[in-house]
């Protein structure tokens, strides 16, 4: 089993637990569900059980264009209907995902990266301004994940760029999930 399968498995566990957690707002659960779908397909791909790179890429793209903005909404507008009602969270995810698909079809490849980066940067700024240490560490972890992956950083032959993405996303989403759960309680 290669390192990508292991790190994607960790991301799958974290995102799946958030997605099924009844104490989380719908917006973070939908975002986590999209990330979990990509991670599940990544595990299947990287273990060789079901190598479907296009499906993994598709759901990763949905994560970038729909899940990251939805995650930002969870914290930027935590009291809104968009963050707290399934109907509006779902509509937002579908529209954001559709925009991502259109951008992909038009070969506007930077769209997904730009949306993810802007969403995560907004999370970082909001967390710093509100002096929320847990959310800040989580948001900075997500920012680290996006930046290291975009820069194609690897560590010798041990960790590939995707490994850093998976590890820092798992850490960031876990911490942000914990923060969202604490706020809801």
Walk through the language-model features, giving the residues of each.
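N-terminal topogenic module of multi-pass integral membrane proteins
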Residues: 1-57, 185
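Residues within membrane-spanning alpha-helices of integral membrane proteins
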Residues: 8, 29-39, 90-94, 113, ...
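Hydrophobic cores of alpha-helical transmembrane segments in multi-pass inner/ER membrane proteins
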Residues: 8-20, 64-79, 118-125, 166-183
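Membrane-interfacial loop-to-transmembrane alpha-helix junctions, especially the N-terminal start
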Residues: 24-35, 81-92, 130-141, 185
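Aromatic-anchored segments of alpha-helical transmembrane domains
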Residues: 36-44, 93-105, 140-153
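Membrane-interface helix caps and helix-loop-helix hairpins in membrane proteins
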Residues: 50-54, 101-112, 153-160
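Membrane-proximal helix-loop-helix units in multi-pass membrane proteins
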Residues: 57-126
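C-terminal transmembrane-bundle signature of multipass membrane proteins
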Residues: 129-185
């Amino acid at each position: 089993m290669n390192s990508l399968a292991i790190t994607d498995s960790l991301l799958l566990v974290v995102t799946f637990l958030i997605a099924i957690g009844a104490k989380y707002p719908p917006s973070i659960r939908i975002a986590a569900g999209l990330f979990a779908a990509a991670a599940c397909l990544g595990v299947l791909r990287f273990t060789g059980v079901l190598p479907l790179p296009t499906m993994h890429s598709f759901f990763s793209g949905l994560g970038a264009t729909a899940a990251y903005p939805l995650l930002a909404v969870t914290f930027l507008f935590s009291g809104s209907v968009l963050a707290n009602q399934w109907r509006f969270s779902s509509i937002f995810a579908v529209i954001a995902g559709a925009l991502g698909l259109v951008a992909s079809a038009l070969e506007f490849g930077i769209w997904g990266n730009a949306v993810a980066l802007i969403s995560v940067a907004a999370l970082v700024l909001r967390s710093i301004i509100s002096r929320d240490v847990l959310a800040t560490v989580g948001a900075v972890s997500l920012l680290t994940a996006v930046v290291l992956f975009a820069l194609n950083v690897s560590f010798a032959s041990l960790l590939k760029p995707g490994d850093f993405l998976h590890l820092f996303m798992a850490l960031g989403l876990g911490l942000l999930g914990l923060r969202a759960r604490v706020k809801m309680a």
